[in-house]
Structure formats: structure tokens, C-alpha cells
């Protein structure tokens, strides 16, 4: 799925969420989240935030979303420790690999996962996790 297809799919999946575009990224907030402190989902399109995923490549973007500690552990093992400088965490994953669910390069310690340019099948498999992230954001 290219970036526009993903944006369309996410807007259809979360029609009541508020999407904010800033810093070459899209931030999804649950309806009613007036303070907008933490999105439940982001889509990053450039290396401005980190270079781990090499998003400067043609057609690359990264979909990021929160998981519960149990969801994270069942997929990747224990939550890693955050770096003191909040830099890229070494989880053993190639953060530039396309269409592969993996820990987020920086926010894995907070239970975030990501996928670089997911295919349609991968996206469909992620929908339950994305909906769960949205439900948590509503509370």
C-alpha cells in the first residue's frame, strides 16, 4: 500500500478520530481527546524524527501504533529499556525492512510497534491491533 492508500484506509477505519498533520507526520487522536498529549497511531513519512527506517527511500513511510505490554511481549519479548537520550533502541530488528511488524525504533520501551510500508494483507492483519489501540485511547 502506498502512503495515500494507507491514509485513506486509516481515515475509513477511524472516521471519528482527529488527524493532525505536523512535522512531516500524521497523528491520530481519539475523538474527545482535547489535550492531544498522546496519539494512538502515527504515520511518519520522512527521516526527520529518526533515520532508523530510512524513510527517505522512494515510497517508504512508517505506520506506528501502541500495544499493551502483553501484546508487545507476545510478539517481541519483554519491553526493552529506553536509552537515556531516547535514541534508537537495539532490538535486533532491521527497522528499514518493509512489510514487517517490529518494535518501534525509539518508542519500543513504551510498547509501540511499527511497520514500514505494509502490504494490504499485513494491514488487514493489523486492523484488530489498531482498533484496540483506538479503544484504549478512548478511555
Model-predicted regions and their roles:
Residues 1-139:
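Charge-dense, helix-prone N-terminal extensions
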Amino acid at each position: 500500500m502506498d502512503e495515500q492508500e494507507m491514509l485513506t484506509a486509516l481515515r475509513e477505519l477511524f472516521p471519528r478520530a482527529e488527524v493532525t498533520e505536523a512535522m512531516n507526520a500524521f497523528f491520530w487522536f481519539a475523538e474527545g481527546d482535547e489535550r492531544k498529549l498522546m496519539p494512538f497511531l502515527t504515520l511518519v513519512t520522512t527521516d526527520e524524527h529518526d533515520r532508523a527506517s530510512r524513510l527517505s527511500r522512494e515510497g517508504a513511510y512508517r505506520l506506528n501504533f501502541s500495544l499493551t505490554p502483553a501484546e508487545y511481549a507476545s510478539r517481541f519479548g519483554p519491553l526493552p529499556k529506553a536509552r537515556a537520550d531516547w535514541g534508537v533502541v537495539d532490538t535486533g530488528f532491521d527497522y528499514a525492512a518493509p512489510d514487517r511488524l517490529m518494535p518501534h525504533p525509539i518508542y519500543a520501551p513504551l510498547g509501540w510497534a511499527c511497520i514500514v510500508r505494509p502490504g494490504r494483507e499485513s494491514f488487514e492483519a493489523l486492523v484488530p491491533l489498531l482498533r484496540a489501540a483506538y479503544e484504549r485511547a478512548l478511555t
